[in-house]
Amino acid sequence: MSIVDEKARQLLDKACAAENGRAAKLLVNDGPLRQTVIALKQGTMLQEHNSPPAASIFLFSGEVKVAGKEETTIGAGQLVTLTHQRHSVSALEDSVFLLTTVTSVEGRESHSGQS
């Protein structure tokens, strides 16, 4: 088992024990760049929220659904960019993913789904 697998397992154990079914660890906070590992217990949802100017999810394990104007199911080992719309994230299975965001881009704001 790799160190990444072990850390992901520990974070998922923490999420499964948490009342809200989730746990997160910020790995990188450098200017506008953020990288956070997030663990969600099956059935847990991150409620609809605005998308930052740029974001991606890499799923280490499990399966999640990202729902906004469109729905996308992401499986283990997949990397996807997030839409520039409001969206929610639901854990279809116990899941751990790396969320990478760029919180500011000159001339662009967070995407609220408004035209």
Label every model-predicted segment.
Residues 1-32, 67, 113-115:
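A short, N-terminal "cap"/entry segment at the start of jelly-roll beta-barrel domains
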Residues 20-21, 31-51, 84:
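Conserved short histidine dyad/triad with adjacent acidic residue
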Residues 42, 52-69:
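Glycine- and acidic-residue-biased ligand/ion/polar-headgroup-sensing regions
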Residues 45, 78-79, 96:
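Residue-level marker of beta-strand positions
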Residues 46-48, 66-67, 86-92:
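Short beta-strand His + acidic residue motifs that chelate non-heme Fe in jelly-roll/DSBH
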Residues 60-61, 75-76, 93:
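A cytosolic small-molecule/anion-sensing beta-strand core signal
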Residues 69-85:
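Short acidic-glycine-tyrosine-enriched beta hairpin
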Residues 84-107:
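Ligand-binding loop in jelly-roll beta-barrel domains
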